[in-house]
Amino acid sequence: MSKIIELPEILANQIAAGEVIERPSSVVKELVENSIDAGASQITIEIEEAGLKSIQVTDNGEGIDHEDVPLALRRHATSKIKKQADLFRIRTLGFRGEAIPSIASVSRFTIETATEAGRHGTLLVAQGGEIEEHVPTSSPVGTKIKIEDLFFNTPARLKYMKSQQAELSHIVDVINRLSLAHPEVAFTLISDGREMTRTAGSGNLRQAIAGIYGLATAKKMVEISASDLDFEVSGYVSLPELTRANRNYITILINGRYIKNFLLNRAILDGYGSKLMVGRFPLAVINIQIDPYLADVNVHPTKQEVRISKERELMALISQAIATSLKEQDLIPDALENLAKSTVKRASKPEQTSLPLKENRLYYDKKQNDFFLKPQVAEQQLSFEESAKPVHEATDEKAEPQSTSVKFAERKPVSYDQLDHPELDQASLERAVDKLEQEEKSSFPELEYFGQMHGTYLFAQGKGGLYIIDQHAAQERVKYEYYREKIGDVDNSQQQLLVPYIFEFPADDMLRIKQRMELLEDAGIFLEEYGANQFILREHPIWFKEEEIEAGIYEMCDMLLLTKEVSIKKYRAELAIMMSCKRSIKANHSLDDYSARDLLFQLSQCDNPYNCPHGRPVLVNFTKSDMEKMFRRIQENHTSLRELGKY
């Protein structure tokens, strides 16, 4: 008797649903993407109990013909590709023909649809993938799909759903990403009768950003644009003063498809250079137009992982586009806004792991046919508070002498659990180290020094108003650029070690390091195999101080494992940051007038005078307008979304 059998269609669809439909947000994503592929300009999503009770997606797309509706529930039935060559030129969001049958197999499924050419609409009802009703009906052109009792026949999946608030947050995240990817589509998301998100569908990306993040955020987004023979990059990135604690506010789009790509995330951060604080991430919406032949989206059923040809060239293009746009901006933070943020008390809430789930403050004025921002009134009185903390000198600890003939290097364990990709870099490595890229000099205001406060802050005035300068951050930037140039040129001459070092690695890391050993050797680091899972180092480049060898070699190997490259410049940049921090003046240190003026002059000559190497602001600016607002001499005006489109 044959042991191998062909699985029934329903069971096969339920197995496929395990990959395609992970949670209610997966259903929303697949249905909305189908609506976009159908040419819809208006899409309404209505959910109950975070989608577990019901999900309804209504669009005004082209609809489905009566005879095609049952086929939509058959696995691998699709209208989007017809031959093998189409796989290499995919221009639609969906193409696998798995989503609808997978959804229908784990829910009570109802679809109403009509085409412009059809004499009537179609109603189809299915339960657990089995069609129960397929009849003509009267309905407008477009499609309405309703999913009820999701996972009713797969209780194991239902058991592991998170709280309704968490599942709702995932749905909002999906709609926000799709709204940014397709600003030409008007999206409306309604949860339990309450409107969560509404976008105008005007095609203006900045207006879509305002509809999701708010007007204040949209005003601080800088437009970017760049292209070459293969790629066209456009979108918006936030000014360095506007950051978040995680990468969840970075949206990368390829041909209108939201994707997750760690290397492109890194390219965005590289474009900021040292303008971002360590551990902080920008808001960004990067839209990449690419020949479909260069992007393989047939990697995973969710289609969020994309393999890109010429990825390094694309990374360089993105970084350059961001760096160029930021260079043209005034990067001195507005002091009044920073002051308001630090002194107006708000209820604390836990850090979110997705795009913010909150009630939109935009309201619609029917008379003016436009959106406006509801004003927020801060009742807390503003006050100046000293918030800077002194930077302490680091202390050097001398290691005890070794009695053995070789030194066994010790390292701190590196956790790969938090990495988005096991081969790629993480924030702790990528943020503080990429500082040796030459930055164009920006226009710096002419400042007239007139005083110091608490031995910490310098006061100066210029055409732009009052400037307050953090003297430690200012000198740190000056000294960093000095040390950067001083140690930037690398000599690969070798020096023998009297006592070799032994480095231990896990077996999988050993294999990957051996595969890429040439990159280490190009950097002047020659490791030899020495026993099981061990390398021995008998000589070192002369630019490596001996006290740096232990930590430095491990750091170079980590860089190799995570980023598939070894950059001496990045490693040396870390050293320049450390030296500049240690040797700069600290808080509570009074400067005479000559020293203060000289420091401001040296700062004005820096490539990037606005941030210290760690990304903290060097100076803030109170404009005349800011002062008048503080003393209630003028009132702020509210900006409409229509006016925002003029930016």
UniProtKB/Swiss-Prot annotation:
SUPFAM superfamilies attached to this UniProt entry: ATPase domain of HSP90 chaperone/DNA topoisomerase II/histidine kinase, DNA mismatch repair protein MutL, Ribosomal protein S5 domain 2-like
Gene Ontology cellular component list: mismatch repair complex
GO annotation, biological process: mismatch repair
Gene3D superfamilies with a match to the protein in the record: 3.30.230.10, Histidine kinase-like ATPase, C-terminal domain, MutL, C-terminal domain, dimerisation subdomain, MutL, C-terminal domain, regulatory subdomain
Lineage: Bacteria, Bacillati, Bacillota, Bacilli, Lactobacillales
Homology family: Belongs to the DNA mismatch repair MutL/HexB family.
Organism superkingdom: Bacteria
UniProt keyword annotations, A-Z: DNA damage, DNA repair
Region of interest called Disordered, as start-end residue ranges on this chain: 387-412
Classification via HAMAP family: DNA_mis_repair (MF_00149)
Protein name as annotated: DNA mismatch repair protein MutL
GO terms of molecular function: ATP binding; ATP hydrolysis activity; ATP-dependent DNA damage sensor activity; mismatched DNA binding
Role this protein plays: This protein is involved in the repair of mismatches in DNA. It is required for dam-dependent methyl-directed DNA mismatch repair. May act as a 'molecular matchmaker', a protein that promotes the formation of a stable complex between two or more DNA-binding proteins in an ATP-dependent manner without itself being part of a final effector complex.
Primary gene name: mutL
Biased composition (Basic and acidic residues): 387-400
Keyword Hydrolase tagged: no
